[in-house]
A protein has these predicted regions:
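A short helix-loop-beta submotif of the ANL/AMP-binding
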Residues: 97-103
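Short beta->alpha connector loops at strand-helix junctions that form conserved
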Residues: 85, 104-109
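Active-site phosphate-binding strand-loop segment of PLP-dependent enzymes
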Residues: 107-149
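Conserved PLP-anchoring active-site segment centered on the Schiff-base-forming lysine
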Residues: 73-95
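Glycine/Thr-rich phosphate-binding loops of Rossmann-like dinucleotide-binding domains
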Residues: 9, 67, 91-92, 142-143
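N-terminal small-domain helix-loop-helix segment of the aminotransferase-like
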Residues: 2-62, 69
């Protein structure tokens, strides 16, 4: 990465502040401002007419930790989590590493595109031990964008 060369040295106070922050060792998002929550909730309200409470939200900086958090919060150990295969392999880790079972509903390849097998999906989701489905949209790796239809 390139930055402009300055005509003068950086102030000692700035250098020290950078050293102190670097010594902390955590470089991700450590503070989530209230404005972020308001913007997120406002977007859902404006776009879909759906109101939510701030307490319902869990801020995550990446998809994989978010999926693992969702699996832990919405299921209990030993329950099944359904995924439509082929699917991003990290989903399997998020399920198994949290003590849950993988339930696969393979996608069908028809007419040059992947399709959901709704009969298989319904059968597997009717199992009382299958308590969560991870819907990947757009689907990775098949690239399919699922529509309401």
């Amino acid at each position: 990465m390139w930055v402009a060369d300055m005509d003068f040295q950086t102030a000692p106070e700035i250098q020290e502040a950078i050293r102190e922050r670097a010594a902390h060792g955590v470089f991700g998002y450590s503070i989530v401002p209230e404005e972020w929550y308001q913007a997120y909730m406002g977007w859902w309200e404006h776009r879909y007419g759906f109101s939510m409470e701030k307490e319902w939200l869990v801020f995550c900086t990446r998809v994989v930790p978010a999926i693992s958090s969702m699996v832990r919060k919405m299921t209990t150990p030993g329950e099944n989590v359904l995924v439509q295969t082929p699917v991003y392999n990290i989903f399997f880790n998020s399920i198994v590493n949290n003590g849950r079972n993988i339930m696969e509903s393979p996608l069908r390849y028809d007419e040059n595109a992947y399709q959901m097998d709704f009969e298989d999906l319904e059968r597997k989701l009717s199992n009382p031990q299958t308590t969560l489905m991870i819907l990947c949209n757009p689907h990775n790796p098949v690239g399919r964008i699922w529509s309401r239809d």
